[in-house]
UniProtKB/Swiss-Prot annotation:
Keyword Magnesium on entry: no
Source species, domain of life: Eukaryota
Organism placement in taxonomy: Eukaryota, Metazoa, Chordata, Craniata, Vertebrata
Keywords: Disulfide bond, Hemostasis impairing toxin, Secreted, Signal, Toxin
The protein's name in its UniProt record: Snaclec A3
Alphabetized GO MF terms: toxin activity
Protein function: Interferes with one step of hemostasis (modulation of platelet aggregation, or coagulation cascade, for example).
Cystine connections: 27-38, 55-154, 129-146
Length: 156
């Protein structure tokens, strides 16, 4: 009887320690959860378009990360900082935003179709695609050449 109580108590402790950590989210192994979404940093060098295609091919509803708040921006910055593998191409990480018209104005939505509710620009010039910059600890958005291969983060 005493052993049964000990095992039950041990399971209760494990359950309580996991609640609130994101472990209760339905994220795949290797993905991190934050406020109902799952994120993963990929240490693959791809152009913006190839990175977006890679994300969508992983499963339905996956796209390059869209950042909707300062809280989410901070979460993504920490996730990238902790998971990026250092190479000469890690100065930038793609996010799901790019210019969609000939005047190079940004689209009014992220690559996943959600509206742009939060902005965190560091530069005004336009090179069509946006990413996070290591020099800002991945906290500011910078304009980048879409054809350059960089690491990226997918979100579902």
């Amino acid at each position: 009887m005493g052993r049964s109580i000990s095992v039950s108590f041990g399971l209760l402790v494990v359950f309580l320690s996991l609640s609130g950590t994101g472990a209760d989210q339905d994220c795949l192994p290797g993905w991190s959860s934050h406020e109902g979404h799952c994120y993963k940093v990929f240490n693959l060098d791809k152009t913006w378009e190839d990175a977006e295609k890679f994300c969508t091919e992983q499963a339905n509803s996956r796209h390059l990360v869209s950042i909707d708040s300062k809280k989410e921006a901070n979460f993504v910055a920490e996730l990238v900082s902790q998971n990026i593998k250092e190479t000469r191409r890690t100065d930038f990480v793609w996010i799901g935003l790019r210019a969609e018209d000939k005047r190079q104005h940004c689209s009014s939505e992220w690559s996943d179709g959600s509206s742009i509710n939060y902005q965190n620009w560091i530069e005004a010039e336009s090179k069509k695609c946006l990413g996070l910059e290591k020099q800002t600890r991945y906290r500011k958005w910078v304009n980048l050449n879409c054809g350059q291969p960089y690491r990226f983060t997918c979100e579902i």
